[in-house]
Curated annotation (Swiss-Prot):
PANTHER family: ADENYLATE CYCLASE-ASSOCIATED CAP C-TERMINAL DOMAIN-CONTAINING PROTEIN (PTHR33747:SF1), UPF0225 PROTEIN SCO1677 (PTHR33747). Gene3D superfamilies: 3.10.450.50. Pfam families: YchJ_M-like. InterPro entries: NTF2-like_dom_sf (IPR032710), UPF0225 (IPR023006), YchJ-like_M (IPR048469). Belongs to the UPF0225 family. The lineage of its organism: Bacteria, Pseudomonadati, Pseudomonadota, Betaproteobacteria, Burkholderiales. This is UPF0225 protein BPP1723. It comes from the Bacteria. It comes from Bordetella parapertussis (strain 12822 / ATCC BAA-587 / NCTC 13253).
Length: 133
């Protein structure tokens, strides 16, 4: 796992806040796993991917679709940014977030464009799955 950014560092999710005041609060501490909505969870999951916080990713993945394990980022992967294209809550317990995540691997830029589905159970949001665009 990579070390989270120090206090003045911007959050990897792209919000204009320091990591501890943004996604860091969902990754550890009193608000651990308590992202208030699907978009916040999506942003916190992106930050967790950037920081190789695999336990957080697994804990925020719905048990019905969760893989048994995740591999850390390859050494040549550099995450470049997240853009939220759309965020929509269908009802109190279902939401979707469309995003584009940019990364560079082996010197080659690529992007992941996904429409992700989220569900809220027992007061917690979970990533369920997504459709690659």
């Amino acid at each position: 796992m990579k070390k989270p950014p120090s206090s003045p560092a911007a959050c990897p999710c792209g919000k204009p806040r320091a990591y501890p005041d943004c996604c860091g609060r969902w990754h550890a501490g009193a608000l651990f796993l308590q992202a208030p909505d699907a978009e916040s969870l999506m942003r916190s999951r992106y930050s967790a991917f950037v920081l190789d916080q695999l336990d957080y990713l697994l804990q925020t993945w719905h048990p019905d679709t969760r893989p048994s394990e995740l591999e850390p980022n390859a050494a040549d992967v550099k995450w470049l940014g997240l853009q939220i294209k759309a965020s929509q809550q269908q009802d109190d317990t279902h939401a979707t977030v469309e995003f584009v995540a940019r990364l560079r691997q082996a010197g080659r830029a690529t992007r992941l464009h996904e429409l992700s589905r989220f569900v809220k159970e027992e007061q917690r949001w979970y990533y369920v799955d997504g459709d690659i665009r």
